[in-house]
């Protein structure tokens, strides 16, 4: 069995991140602008409001975002065009649970549903009240139920 939490794809081709994002990340990292790279990801890729990111930069956890900012280019390369890879997904032959937060951005729930629909043995579950940073005490029971 397999479980996925909020697969980071898009259904709408117009919602995809900028095509030059790998170059943008690499330039920012080379220039020592790790925070800018993290901000670029949050605003240009995920679509978070700039005011959220401005506040995020003041939070204690922001240093962690900067520390891993160099990996954003790796992620962008792996993701390709960021559209749901339905042909690849359809080849997964194990029972798969696709989870998303019920309080998260709508595109995450839509994507989770689309992936579950494309899987031969897929099911989707939305965890009420949860955002992207899911509470482990909410996630664990859903996973336990599925894997038993």
Residue positions per predicted region:
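Catalytic active-site module of serine/aspartate enzymes centered on a nucleophile-bearing elbow/loop
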Residues: 120-148
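Short beta-strand/loop motif that positions the catalytic acidic residue
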Residues: 92, 98-100
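Hydrophobic, aromatic-rich cap/lid helix
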Residues: 60-84
């Amino acid at each position: 069995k397999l479980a996925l939490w909020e697969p980071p794809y898009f259904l709408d081709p117009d919602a995809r991140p900028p095509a030059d994002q790998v170059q943008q990340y690499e330039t920012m990292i080379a220039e020592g602008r790790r925070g800018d790279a993290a901000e670029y990801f949050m605003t240009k890729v995920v679509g978070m409001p700039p005011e959220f990111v401005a506040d995020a930069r003041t939070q204690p956890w922001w240093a962690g975002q900067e520390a891993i900012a160099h990996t954003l280019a790796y992620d962008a390369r792996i993701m390709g065009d960021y559209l749901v890879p339905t042909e690849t997904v359809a080849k997964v032959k194990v029972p798969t649970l696709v989870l998303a937060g019920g309080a998260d951005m709508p595109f995450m729930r839509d994507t989770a549903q689309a992936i579950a629909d494309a899987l031969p043995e897929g099911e989707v579950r939305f965890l009420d009240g949860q955002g992207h940073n899911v509470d482990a005490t909410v996630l664990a029971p859903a996973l336990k139920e599925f894997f038993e």
